[in-house]
Amino acid sequence: MPELPEVEVVRRGLQDHVVGKTMTAVRVHHPRAVRRHEAGPADLTARLLGARISGTDRRGKYLWLTLDAGAPTTGRDDPDTALVVHLGMSGQMLLGGVPRAEHVRISAVLDDGTVLSFADQRTFGGWQLADLVSVDGSVVPAPVAHLARDPLDPLFDVDSVIKVLRGKHSEIKRQLLDQQVVSGIGNIYADEALWRAKVHGARVAATLTRRQLGAVLDAAADVMREALAKGGTSFDSLYVNVNGQSGYFDRSLDAYGREGEHCRRCGAVMRREKFMNRSSFYCPRCQPRPRR
């Protein structure tokens, strides 16, 4: 599943290419792609027709396009709304041609002739329209309001998150994956952050010191910034930017996917274990398991 860096790469591409443009035609090719929009496909297409894209934003793994209220071509007087995009496991926001047309679930034609397509092979992602609401000093779509801030958010408060983690009596990795504690971190970057901080993912969050928790959160922010600079992590053709190009941070991973390889820090053989129906990768020497 795309995590924060991959979603931010897509957002930046959309910011550069679609802001200021108006949707002149919209077609839903697969109803599952708009299942989160409770009013249905016809309502979504009608409300998007003539809508002007005024900006882009993101929180965690969700991104959205801000739409001008009451687009002049429609005469509507809607409240400020956003087109919320969740990429799911394999969603892509593509401009221009698409390599596999059969995977296109939604398409929108912009006023300059550009086609914006939502392709999704596994159909876990989708689009929905939502009102923008004010939450904790930020304006976000209502379906995103429950998410915590992510480590790259300018208003992310490390001390406040540490305080929350100090009260959690479950594994630190479980907490990193909880989007209501800190958003944007998935399995890949959780393993990378824990490796950098020399903390085993099975350690109970409440037993870690403030310094250790701070190190984990700082490492998460650092590794995601580095991944963002390299276009994100792409293990296959499913994770691409708006131009269909893959990222290459997978070549720089220190923990994830490196079972049986030597730790780049101490030389021990990296291990893999099951955790929450996922795989966790760690160094047994740098990140010793907690005692039972």
Curated annotation (Swiss-Prot):
What is this protein's name? Formamidopyrimidine-DNA glycosylase
UniProt keyword list: DNA damage, DNA repair, DNA-binding, Glycosidase, Hydrolase, Lyase, Metal-binding, Multifunctional enzyme, Zinc, Zinc-finger
Stretches annotated zinc finger (FPG-type): 254-288
Coiled-coil positions: none
- What InterPro entries does this protein's entry cite? DNA_glyclase/AP_lyase_DNA-bd (IPR015886), DNA_glyclase_Znf_dom_DNA_BS (IPR015887), Formamido-pyr_DNA_Glyclase (IPR020629), FPG_cat (IPR012319), MutM-like_N-ter (IPR035937), Ribosomal_uS13-like_H2TH (IPR010979), Znf_DNA_glyclase/AP_lyase (IPR000214), Znf_FPG/IleRS (IPR010663)
Active-site residues are 2-3, 61, 278
Entries under SUPFAM superfamilies matching the protein: Glucocorticoid receptor-like (DNA-binding domain) (SSF57716), N-terminal domain of MutM-like DNA repair proteins (SSF81624), S13-like H2TH domain (SSF46946)
In terms of SMART domains, this protein maps to: Fapy_DNA_glyco, H2TH
Instruction: Give the GO molecular function terms.
Output: 8-oxo-7,8-dihydroguanine DNA N-glycosylase activity; class I DNA-(apurinic or apyrimidinic site) endonuclease activity; damaged DNA binding; zinc ion binding
GO terms classed as biological process: base-excision repair
- Please give the organism: Mycobacterium marinum (strain ATCC BAA-535 / M)
Q: How does it assemble?
A: Monomer.
Function of the molecule: Involved in base excision repair of DNA damaged by oxidation or by mutagenic agents. Acts as a DNA glycosylase that recognizes and removes damaged bases. Has a preference for oxidized purines, such as 7,8-dihydro-8-oxoguanine (8-oxoG). Has AP (apurinic/apyrimidinic) lyase activity and introduces nicks in the DNA strand. Cleaves the DNA backbone by beta-delta elimination to generate a single-strand break at the site of the removed base with both 3'- and 5'-phosphates.
- Residues bound to DNA: 103, 122, 168
Q: Catalysed reaction per UniProt?
A: Hydrolysis of DNA containing ring-opened 7-methylguanine residues, releasing 2,6-diamino-4-hydroxy-5-(N-methyl)formamidopyrimidine; 2'-deoxyribonucleotide-(2'-deoxyribose 5'-phosphate)-2'-deoxyribonucleotide-DNA = a 3'-end 2'-deoxyribonucleotide-(2,3-dehydro-2,3-deoxyribose 5'-phosphate)-DNA + a 5'-end 5'-phospho-2'-deoxyribonucleoside-DNA + H(+)
Question: What's this protein's family per the entry?
Answer: Belongs to the FPG family.
